[in-house]
Amino acid sequence: MIDVNTVVEKFKSRQALIGIVGLGYVGLPLMLRYNAIGFDVLGIDIDDVKVDKLNAGQCYIEHIPQAKIAKARASGFEATTDFSRVSECDALILCVPTPLNKYREPDMSFVINTTDALKPYLRVGQVVSLESTTYPGTTEEELLPRVQEGGLVVGRDIYLVYSPEREDPGNPNFETRTIPKVIGGHTPQCLEVGIALYEQAIDRVVPVSSTKAAEMTKLLENIHRAVNIGLVNEMKIVADRMGIDIFEVVDAAATKPFGFTPYYPGPGLGGHCIPIDPFYLTWKAREYGLHTRFIELSGEVNQAMPEYVLGKLMDGLNEAGRALKGSRVLVLGIAYKKNVDDMRESPSVEIMELIEAKGGMVAYSDPHVPVFPKMREHHFELSSEPLTAENLARFDAVVLATDHDKFDYELIKAEAKLVVDSRGKYRSPAAHIIKA
């Protein structure tokens, strides 16, 4: 047993060693924030390549400047694959993936395997915080028994909290420090220690009554967005059939100063959270005999968008007297959103696969993704095509899937034979531009 005040004071005095487990789009910015305010930080990851790059002062995420990594390294940050060093840490913040399996059900293997790897090295006085997006009950059902397996009692010897990550890669308006941090603890003592951990690094910490409430908060945030995007994607289809520009309509509706929040249609949902989180809740709800029909319907609409874009591409080619089979198609933007290199759950990749499955010859251009990376479910041996007049002329059609600012939209409009615009970038009508 340890006095909770002693643990709290260690964080308030910034004498604690912060362990970040999982050094990706969530863990790396968090590491940089704690390092910047004077904490010693140890990064832990199973990926040797990532660890070696970080220890060499290099970065593998485009929107994080390499100079920041080099500065952190010079001021004491270290990365390792050695989980035995967990015992050195006063805080362990878990930032690992929570994807879906092939049945569209939660894949908790990363969380469970990581916690199992930590177990032998947990000790009195530590706080364990899970940040991965997950279903309500994960912290209590999966982490709690594992943390206590060696005899430590949560709330007395060791502290357990859930604080969902809210990173938005590439967003220039918000950073780790300025995004409020929701947190729930397994006990009041856990919450007290968790607040002490995060209030050093985050401007505003928002405590809630339990880890379940914190887990549900994250799901509500993202399901709210997914459902509203599903709504506007469905309205896009109706508006298109009626000859109405949905982007014009959304912009006009957004002038109402109350009761309306603008959401814009696109080729489908991307990123690690928005396309996945609804399935976490629908899966857990079934345990309680409930069916989340509204959420599931919006998911069906969003999942159908790549097929909708494909249909628009085929229509455009048919109008030009061509079939998709044998046509050369350039997909513009394969990251899941503009101005980043993050390809997690990108609908662009599904569009590429659909084009290929129909016999089209697919290529891509993305200034943020020079080479198609290794992905768990998708595989293309491709590099980004230069966006030049000569190159655009080689393709029978281009599909604007992600509207990066670095694209030359006037060049695309002038040189492409057919443009399928899934992002509403081209508002003025043109014979060779099809809105999708």
Swiss-Prot record:
EC number per UniProt: 1.1.1.136
Keyword terms of this UniProt record: Cell wall biogenesis/degradation, Lipopolysaccharide biosynthesis, Membrane, NAD, Oxidoreductase, Transmembrane, Transmembrane helix
Localization of this protein: Membrane
Subunit structure and binding partners: Homotrimer in solution. May also exist in a dimeric or tetrameric form.
Record InterPro entries: 6-PGluconate_DH-like_C_sf, NAD(P)-bd_dom_sf, UDP-Glc/GDP-Man, UDP-Glc/GDP-Man_DH_C, UDP-Glc/GDP-Man_DH_C_sf, UDP-Glc/GDP-Man_DH_dimer, UDP-Glc/GDP-Man_DH_N, UDP_ManNAc/GlcNAc_DH
Membrane topology: Single-pass membrane protein
SUPFAM superfamilies: 6-phosphogluconate dehydrogenase C-terminal domain-like, NAD(P)-binding Rossmann-fold domains, UDP-glucose/GDP-mannose dehydrogenase C-terminal domain
Pfam families: UDPG_MGDP_dh, UDPG_MGDP_dh_C, UDPG_MGDP_dh_N
Cofactor requirement: K(+); NH4(+)
GO cellular component: membrane
GO function term, MF aspect, one: oxidoreductase activity, acting on the CH-CH group of donors, NAD or NADP as acceptor
Organism: Pseudomonas aeruginosa (strain ATCC 15692 / DSM 22644 / CIP 104116 / JCM 14847 / LMG 12228 / 1C / PRS 101 / PAO1)
Catalytic activity: UDP-N-acetyl-alpha-D-glucosamine + 2 NAD(+) + H2O = UDP-2-acetamido-2-deoxy-alpha-D-glucuronate + 2 NADH + 3 H(+)
Amino acids binding NAD(+): 13-34
Pathways per UniProt: Bacterial outer membrane biogenesis; LPS O-antigen biosynthesis
GO process annotations (BP): cell wall organization; O antigen biosynthetic process; polysaccharide biosynthetic process
pH-dependent activity: Optimum pH is 8.0-9.0.
Function recorded in the entry: Plays a role in the biosynthesis of B-band O antigen for serotype O5.
Active site positions: 273
Name of the encoding gene: wbpA
Enzyme class: oxidoreductase
Temperature and activity: Optimum temperature is 33-37 degrees Celsius. Active from temperatures ranging from 0 degrees Celsius to 65 degrees Celsius.
Protein name in UniProt: UDP-N-acetyl-D-glucosamine 6-dehydrogenase
Cofactor details (free text): A monovalent cation. NH4(+) and K(+) are the most effective.
UniProt cross-references to Gene3D superfamilies, sorted A to Z: NAD(P)-binding Rossmann-like Domain (3.40.50.720)
S-S bridge residues: none
Family per similarity comment: Belongs to the UDP-glucose/GDP-mannose dehydrogenase family.
